Amino acid sequence: MQIRLVFTLASVTDMNAHARQSSICGKLIAAILWLAAAVTLPQVSPAADWPQFLGPQRNGSIVQPNLAKTWPKEGPSTVWQHKVGQGFGGPVVSTGKLIIFHRVEGKELVECLDATTGKELWKGDYPARYRDDFGFEEGPRATPAIADGRVFTFGANGDFIAWDLAKGTKLWSIDTRAQFKTGKGFFGIACSPLVEGNAVILNIGGKDGAGIVAFDVATGKVRWQATDDEASYASPVAATLGGKRRVLVITRVALVALDAADGKVVFRHAWQPPMSASVSAATPLVISDQIFISASYGTGASLLRFRESAPEVIWSRDEVLSAHYATAVLHEGFLYGFDGRQEQGCELRCVELKTGKVQWSESGLKAGIVTLANDQLLVLTERGELIQTPASPAGFKPSQRAQILPFVARAHPALADGYFYARSKDKLVCVDLRAVDSSKSSSAR
């Protein structure tokens, strides 16, 4: 928020005339004019925050006016690093604070750090109860959300908690597995909370009509619930479609569109991998009245047009862009994302949105996550390499590359005010991607 005191020239002239008549009035006006010139409360720009999974618009994209086009020969500098425990939840940043959610010594730990220095501001924890059946890491899978001075975390075993962003105190907590009789899934609970108005929404797969649940942000009380679907690993997204706010959720068996206000189901579109032990983790991508969805395990990709009761299928096929766990980004009519299963090797692809035509494919990167900043792709591979390349259908032409993390880096990163935040199995880093001449403008962060 920014507050300005504005005076017209005539107003100032009149007041100066009165000031000459009264020394008291003159002093008062001088003070007001000084206030008008000197007092401007800090304004958080759109580039300054990455407060939730996939960024401010929940689509993996952000405008960064101060992003460098070239990096130093030795690579971008690491401003600070912080030791982290198990988990796949990415960092989030709001008003100069960074939240990281991970598992350390038998506890799920929420840490708030100064985003500029990495200094710990507060931390909160509780006993970690999740046990993985396949030998994978047992830390949180979900990325937290920050909204209206609150932090929302969703643990691997279903502990849903609201924290005070300023102090770290626990505001309310819900054991969703106990309250809604949910399972733990093959690989734990992974939905990153979505804050929409006064509700925070989860894809939890509960019984008795509690497949998708909206909770009151202030109290944690249920505002609405819908479907009997089991949960997938995908996180919901909200958008204005058909003139109303809607919530789109990929459950275990379908893409479901709901009214954001009351949870009424608008449509269901069958969407399920053909094999049971599978992952559907990519968040729907909304482009105007169109919805792009993607999954691996023989599922493929579809472009739909929003319609009441049933979406129109524009195109749907498996050989285009089958996302395992990372959501694609869109720039000027072209999708950019990883195709294929992580353990089998993936290709980075560019796909024309309107036709589904593959423009180019780049193998050899294994798997990774793509972030769009302005017209640049920031590709974080699971090997920990950060690659910057123009978002262009003409081809994959990296301009910058640097090793910023060790293997394995699978959590979604954050990009805020020119700083790139990313984590590996045991390390969180803050990497400076600002243009050199923008450091002064970013110093007030």
Q: Model-predicted segments: where are they?
A:
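Intrinsically disordered, low-complexity segments
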Residues: 9, 20-21, 38, 43, ...
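N-terminal secretory signal peptides that target proteins for export/translocation
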Residues: 1-26
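A composition/secondary-structure signal for short, hydrophobic, low-basic-content segments
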Residues: 14-17, 39, 48
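Noncatalytic, solvent-exposed loop/strand surfaces
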Residues: 43-445
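Intrinsically disordered, low-complexity, compositionally biased regions/tails
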Residues: 8, 24, 29-30, 59, ...
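Bacterial N-terminal signal peptides
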Residues: 27-43
